[in-house]
Amino acid sequence: MLSRKWIAAAALVAGTSSVAHAGYIDTTFTSGMTTQVAGATTYDFDSGVKPDGYGGAGAVLTDSVSGMAAAPAGDSTAFLSVAYPSSSGTETFLAAPGQQYNYFGLYWGSIDDYNWIKFYDGSTLLGTVTGTDVIQAGAQLGDQMAPGSNRYVNFALNDMSFNKIEFGTSNFAFESDNHAMAAVPEPGVLALVFAAFGALFLMRRRRTADLTF
């Protein structure tokens, strides 16, 4: 299991009173196509329609579409493709009123540098992660079969919680499956998540995220 950490610096949101916490998002990578966090709520898209809370320029597909969408490697079930059938756009997950999460995981397929995920608490942007941030070192962007560009990615938000996620792409396409969310009690979110993974912590790399407000 590999880990990367992004820092979310406190910043005033222009035109509002919202302030992003001085917290961080820790990103880990685990084997398989599903979360290893016990008790997480999982959305697998197998019903063929988007679950409650999802909306925007995304579609649930049951197979690859040449030149437009590719099923994540090894995934023979339905998956979410953003922004099919368009080349660019965003899909948004909005939590139920009063619900906050600090863990999110997904099986991210054929990771591209023009894919991104943004975490929000209301209108406050907590952090942005792009495909470049999560692809395995040395892997080819957009590879539809290689494990380094098709991987289960876990995000643990420390000293922050989210109620909205934006999935975006500026070209064909952002494919994913088995979204998972959980509210892990703080403090010690990261330690609890690592315990759930049951894997050794191998490497940590810290970098500062460029946030746009």
Regions found by a protein language model. Give the residues of each.
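Sec/Tat signal peptide C-region and signal peptidase I cleavage site
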Residues: 18-22
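Hydrophobic alpha-helical membrane context
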Residues: 16-17, 198
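Bacterial N-terminal signal peptides that target proteins for export
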Residues: 1-7
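A short, hydrophobic C-terminal helix/tail in secreted or cell-surface proteins
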Residues: 186-204
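Surface-exposed, well-ordered secondary-structure segments
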Residues: 23-183
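Bacterial N-terminal signal peptides
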Residues: 9-16
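C-terminal membrane-anchoring or membrane-association module
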Residues: 201-213
